[in-house]
């Protein structure tokens, strides 16, 4: 059975998509689904069975798929408004910078490590940057 991994805003409501980018449900309003909302880009019309081809959205879906389930439930939003600086937000409103979300699996692993470091050290953090060349936890 296909599982919703993200919800996308469309011109007429919301599309629930699986990790392949396929629309598995549409609705005029969000109902109690605990999947991240993909924001920053309005998608015209998505019908049941359509597949999303937008690269920033596809990269975001790959990133979500690469996260461990317990970490995935902490991601509430991914903003794809700037395709070169995609930002995921945790349930604690912590921005996680994903760049262009190239290497989604690597960035998912980096997210896990950096969030563990933040929790372990009880850091007060402005944002996390998952750049593989220079990962960063920016403190307040």
PLM regions and their residue ranges:
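Charged, solvent-exposed interaction patches on well-folded alpha/beta domains
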Residues: 1-140
